[in-house]
Amino acid sequence: MADYINEIKKRRTFAIISHPDAGKTTLTEKFLLYGGAIRLAGSVKARKASTHAVSDWMEIEKQRGISVTSSVMQFNYSGHCINILDTPGHQDFSEDTYRTLMAADSAVMVVDAAKGVEDQTRKLFHVCSLREMPIFTFINKMDREAQDPFQLLEDIEAELGIKTYPMNWPIGSGKDFKGVYDRQNQRIIAFNGGNHGSTEVEAIEGSVEDEKFREILGEALHDKLMEDIELLDIAGDDLDMEKVRVGELTPVFFGSALTNFGVEPFLEHFLEMTTSPLARNSNIGEIDPFDDKFSAFVFKIQANMNKAHRDRIAFMRICSGKFTKGEEVFHMQGGKKLKLAQPQQFMAENREIVEEAYAGDIIGVFDPGIFSIGDTLCAPSKKFRFEGIPTFAPEHFARVRPVDTMKRKQFVKGVTQIAQEGAIQVFKENHVGMEEIIVGVVGVLQFEVLEYRLKNEYNVDIKMDRLAFRYVRWIESYDGDIDKLNLTSDAKRVKDFKDRDLIIFQNDWGINWALDHNKGLVLSGVGKSDE
């Protein structure tokens, strides 16, 4: 018993969020470098000697240098077992990011030191704040020309409405970025570069009072640091861990993921300050992670992670207890007992079978097509459902059909699997078969990914016609006959994959018309996955 409790206490499960190009994937890779999970870090942009970022495993990601799927990686560091959820950096994949954040206990927000808070940072931060998650900020790219650090803190507070507490302070920036000052321990960490970030960086550490740093840093930088320290001590907020835990205050770290400057100090402080797995809400109350009964929920489904395997993996966040390979669990939505075949843990596309896993861990299990996002798995002796994960209303629509009608079977299989992953939403028109469907997406890049994946994974070329619809609403209730709804000529009634009735509209006026002309009609912009 004590063993499994100690294992859970070691777990730290967090997601990394950022605007595209702020350096999120590079930072993820450097965590793995320091954790000993990889020996040599390859630059994401340079792609030297064909080294690709460990977490960017889908071919389209390698070509574009962006993350469009969420990757899951586990490694050990300093007595902790760390689960990193690397989220899509592209704004068109915000729904996938939201689901990933549901599986995390805290978030690391990466901010570009030259640009400050950017559009996608705001959106992702908003999702984190809705969950009242602890958020830790890493201000990246200090090795390039950067904004004034005080200005960056002000920017975060003004743009995001969260207080900041700098845990360390940069010494210089751009080519003069020499290191960081650790405020907690009142120590200077001066970096000795030269390996271009491919291996762990060497550092000279010592007390801020040590005169040798005047020589190492140069008088101008040393004097500026002393002035900044004084200003911070007078003007800044106190570090209130209770406010950190509820997402009202963010500890801020400065560094450069590319050169590794500041990565290890950040990782060490972060692990000290974050918590082990947190309790989760369910229909029977909070589920304690230290409960001895296993429970988990599905937050992601990924088909064809390996083209050679043609497989489909359901990713689960374990929320309580211990999971043992071959253990019988109860699938609430399916209403039956299961044995989870070959539970796996991942380092991007590399996988290994696990014998056991604990609350906080992410495991992948083979999915023969029975799981959906938000499903609960629990011990047969203690049945309950975790809170569902909402479905975002798509904003872009297209009519999609296979170019070759003889490939209808592959087309249906492909769109079904990609829809079950949550990457697209598929709508069926009344009296029209599956040979032609309407696809809804949150962002237009998802159309490109759909086309790419159908061709590369299912050998199906598609014809895609964009539609003028902008809104989808689920029909929650209606007093009359749904087939006789009074709608404008440019609105269309459809069904989703769960056979729920929806209406797609071109504008707000169409929505208001439907509500005004159909007594008792209740519409919702969100579909719950546990329905």
Spans of model-derived segments:
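Structural and coupling elements of P-loop NTPases
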Residues: M1-E531
